[in-house]
Every structure is written in structure tokens, then in C-alpha cells.
Amino acid sequence: LPRLSGQTNEEYNAYKMRATFYSIVGRTVTALTGIAVVADPIIEAPDEIRQLMSDAPYGLQFDELRYRALRDVQLVGRFGILVDSPQGETQDIGIQPYASEAIINWDVDAKGKPTFVQLMEIVWLPDGSGNKQAVLRYRTLKLVEGVYTVTVEDANNSTATIQPKFGGNTIDFIPFYVANPLGLGFDIEKIPMVDLVNLNLSHYRTSADLE
């Protein structure tokens, strides 16, 4: 709450203390997400894809990933998922989640398909003393002569480049998908909860002024 003109420190502290904040946004998001996930999704996919969904990316089960994606789309307007694979076979595939703020740059073709995506990551690596330290790195996904290529660069400008394979073959598209309030796509859409956030803030300020 901003300090009102002429308020002393004591008056300003009392002004803040008497204001009541009721988390309308938090309760609404929790309720809407709960409604969306109460029923199991109908999944039509090959067995290997079903197995992929049962694997836990970064400790997240598929249901948890679904819950997180729904919350993020409501609160910040987007959520990214990378279907990742090292230079191996199908059984090595994993799903990597990315928050909105980690999707820092991208380009798409005329059909809206990504041709370039840059992601920000924080990984915890051993520091040599038995502890771990947070390391910032950037993952760049692009098509090089029509082949999906991944380059990872850390803060020391050390880079590693691979061409992931699925079923032993390189692929000709970038397997990164962004969910937004209107479906799948990289377009920046209006955050669903922004109007309710503004109303919640207005109620909070009115409470401070009138109570």
C-alpha cells in the first residue's frame, strides 16, 4: 500500500495493519485447476508414449505436470514443455517443463511451428567441496539444415551441441510446445487472471481506506 500524503510512520503502519487481503485469485486458480484435473484425461497414444507419461521429469509425475501447466497458464499465461532425448533411442525420451520466464526467445515459421527457441535453465552442480551450486545456462533449440539441433551454453561460455535422435533417427522439427490460454502456440495472450488480480488489489486498497 502506498503511504498517503501527510501520514506519520505510526499512522501508515496502522493503515497497513487494518487492511484485509482476501486471496480471491489464489482460491479461484486452485478451484478451477481442481475442476480441470478431477477426471483422468483420455489419452490416445502408442504404448511407448504412455510409458513416457509415467516417467517423472525432474521428479514430476504426469498428473503433477498437468496441474502445474494449468496453474501457470492461468497465472502467467503460458507454460512450455520440451520432449527431450539425448543421442539415444526412444526409451531415453523425457519431458522437461519450462516456466514462462524461462522461455526467453523464439521464432516461428508461417505455420506457427518453432524454428528457433532459447531457454534459460538453472541446474545444481557439485562445487568440489561436497556441496552444490546453482549454475545458469542457456539451451538453444534450432533447425540446422533441417535437422533438430540443441546447443547448451553455460556462464563460462562452455558449449555442447548434439542432434537428438528418436528411434535412432534425427528429426526435422523442434519438439517444444507452449500452452497458452487459447491452446498451443507461441503468441503472447492476455493472462486469464489479470482482471481478477486488479480487482483483488482494488478490494485490498478499499479495505485499507474504509476500515
Show where each model-derived region lies:
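Extended, Lys/Arg-enriched charged tracts that mediate electrostatic binding to polyanionic substrates
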Residues: 67-162
